[in-house]
């Protein structure tokens, strides 16, 4: 008889196997887009300085932005956070509230030394399949390189949203299915 813990363990094994298979046949890159050559490298002190540039204010599990130009800084799997997840202002997968009509400058940092990640924006909400098909409206970052040599990868993009509800999602197989996504409310 399966217990809840056994079923959960089997589910994670299945997700992991699917992700490994997808990576083996090249589907991980296909799901997240092509390897983006705009990625740059940063040291840990540089990453810490970038994280400080986020212009949002935290209230509970929400980060609220104001003004005509906002700067969102999201990181993939900072130390002390569960894998896989995004962190903004030391919050795991927070809801981001952004004013309609604002220019949104996004910096996405991959600090996870074991995996590449993506930060894509879509209208499709959860739940997400192991192999997500989300039709991103902003294929934000492409597929990140895996950090190496004591450095981390980061990239920037700009988004001009209209009012509505969106989601930021990692399209690497298995990541969104296990919780690597968050909500964006533009109003």
UniProtKB/Swiss-Prot annotation:
Main location: periplasm
Pfam name, any one: Copper-bind
Residues of the Plastocyanin-like domain: 85-187
Record's subcellular location: Periplasm
Flavoprotein as UniProt keyword: no
Binding site for Cu cation: 117, 170, 175, 180
Keywords: Copper, Electron transport, Metal-binding, Periplasm, Signal, Transport
A cellular-component GO term for this protein: periplasmic space
Cofactor(s) for this UniProt protein: Cu cation
Gene Ontology molecular functions: copper ion binding; electron transfer activity
InterPro entries in the cross-refs: BlueCu_1, BlueCu_1_BS, Cu_oxidase_CS, Cupredoxin, Rusticyanin
Keyword field contains Cell inner membrane: no
Domain of life, source organism: Bacteria
Cofactor remark: Binds 1 copper ion per subunit.
Gene3D superfamilies assigned: Cupredoxins - blue copper proteins
Signal peptide: 1-32
Described purpose of this protein according to its UniProt entry: Electron carrier from cytochrome c552 to the A-type oxidase.
NCBIfam families tied to this protein: rusti_cyanin
Subunit record text: Monomer.
Protein name stated in the entry: Rusticyanin
Gene designation: rus
């Amino acid at each position: 008889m399966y217990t809840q813990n056994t079923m959960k363990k089997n589910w994670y094994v299945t997700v992991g196997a699917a992700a490994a298979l997808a990576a083996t046949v090249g589907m991980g890159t296909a799901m997240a887009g092509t390897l983006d050559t705009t990625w740059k490298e940063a040291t840990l002190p540089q990453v810490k300085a970038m994280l400080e540039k986020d212009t949002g204010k935290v209230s509970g599990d929400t980060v609220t932005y104001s003004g005509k130009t906002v700067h969102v800084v999201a990181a993939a799997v900072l130390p002390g956070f569960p894998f896989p997840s995004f962190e903004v202002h030391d919050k795991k997968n927070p809801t981001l509230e952004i004013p309609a009509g604002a220019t949104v400058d996004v910096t996405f940092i991959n600090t996870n030394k074991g995996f590449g990640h993506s930060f894509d924006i879509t209208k499709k909400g959860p739940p997400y399949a192991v192999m997500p098909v989300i039709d991103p409206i902003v294929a934000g970052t492409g597929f990140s390189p895996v950090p190496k040599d004591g450095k981390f990868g980061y990239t920037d993009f700009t988004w001009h949203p209209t009012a509505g509800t969106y989601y930021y999602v990692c399209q690497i197989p298995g990541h969104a299915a296990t919780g690597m996504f968050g909500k964006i409310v533009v109003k």
